[in-house]
Amino acid sequence: MSNWLVDKLIPSIMRSEVKKSSVPEGLWHKCPSCEAVLYRPELEKTLDVCPKCNHHMRIGARARIDIFLDAEGRAELGADLEPVDRLKFRDGKKYKDRLTAAQKQTGEKDALISMSGTLMGMPIVVSAFEFSFMGGSMGAIVGERFVRAANYALENRCPMVCFSASGGARMQEALISLMQMAKTSAVLARLREEGIPFISVLTDPVYGGVSASLAMLGDVIVGEPKALIGFAGPRVIEQTVREKLPEGFQRSEFLLEHGAIDLIISRGELRPRLARLLAQMTGQQTPEEAREAAAVA
């Protein structure tokens, strides 16, 4: 073997391999919209919103709650509840096995997390869908956790906010999942009767039984920028009506323009703007007014 091969080429290859292995996985992320390559720690500072094109990337339920609620005083509701395969359902795979796989992938027991806490000092209860858990589909546990959050709002007379991200009802639970549409709608009717605010935040995507029930029953309905919102997907509708749909059909901007939602708020502004809105809806001081009053005192 020549000295050149031993002295130059082999060490060069070894240095290259060491350099490759020293770069942690997941350190870089490509924006699915503009394809910009983004440094993960910097992306976290923008709450997973692309700084180049403002694309709002999908984030998990706990991440949403973490960036929305105050850090102190949180308590999870219904964390002990776990889904059960009562129908012994099987399509290409047993439902029980699908649940096990989803739980292992996400670290969650089901597709909704409910938590009480405070928003800029204001008592509140929040629910958030975990889209990575079987597409955020709504089954018995999702419905029950949502109802427990609403009942907490009723008992404590505090506002409720829900972040929806779902493909709809969970087909593996058949009529049990469809019943959750009525169940969640009924408890929201009680909130309205009691004059307790419910704000629905629609994130990408919201479809099916969730969009046809709780997601569209907010006193105020907010969409994140360019979120997909509808009942059936655009391709299904086009195949049914045999017509080309308008540009941006089912995007939050299209829905706002046609009066289906009330506001579009960027992720970084959700916390302060919803705090002000809820303070006005409940007759409390806004965070700004509270700070001014404290400064004067």
Swiss-Prot record:
GO MF, one example: zinc ion binding
Native organism: Pseudomonas putida (strain ATCC 47054 / DSM 6125 / CFBP 8728 / NCIMB 11950 / KT2440)
Protein family: Belongs to the AccD/PCCB family.
Swiss-Prot/TrEMBL keywords: ATP-binding, Cytoplasm, Fatty acid biosynthesis, Fatty acid metabolism, Lipid biosynthesis, Lipid metabolism, Metal-binding, Nucleotide-binding, Transferase, Zinc, Zinc-finger
Pathway: Lipid metabolism; malonyl-CoA biosynthesis; malonyl-CoA from acetyl-CoA: step 1/1
Name the record gives this protein: Acetyl-coenzyme A carboxylase carboxyl transferase subunit beta
Domain CoA carboxyltransferase N-terminal: residue ranges: 27-296
Cofactor note (record): Binds 1 zinc ion per subunit.
